[in-house]
């Protein structure tokens, strides 16, 4: 039980440091950009698969 307490304490301290230093805002901005890049790549992949006429892999 003490191990879990220490683990959550460390996680809370790291989250607090990241949240109060402004790194979290930058990381959220980067995450949004990466999300939209991968959505576009997914759509390109789906369209190219549909146009090629290949059946999906089993």
From Swiss-Prot:
It is a multi-pass membrane protein. It is found in: Cell membrane. The keyword Nucleotide-binding does not apply. It comes from the Bacteria. Keywords: Cell membrane, Membrane, Transmembrane, Transmembrane helix. InterPro entries: DUF1328. The chain crosses the membrane at residues 6-26, 27-47. GO terms for cellular component: plasma membrane. Belongs to the UPF0391 family. This is UPF0391 membrane protein Sden_3712. It comes from Shewanella denitrificans (strain OS217 / ATCC BAA-1090 / DSM 15013).
């Amino acid at each position: 039980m003490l191990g879990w307490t220490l683990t959550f304490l460390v996680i809370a301290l790291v989250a607090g440091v990241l949240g109060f230093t402004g790194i979290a805002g930058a990381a959220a901005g980067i995450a949004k950009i990466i999300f939209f890049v991968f959505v576009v790549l997914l759509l390109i992949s789906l369209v190219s698969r549909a146009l090629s006429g290949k059946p999906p892999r089993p």
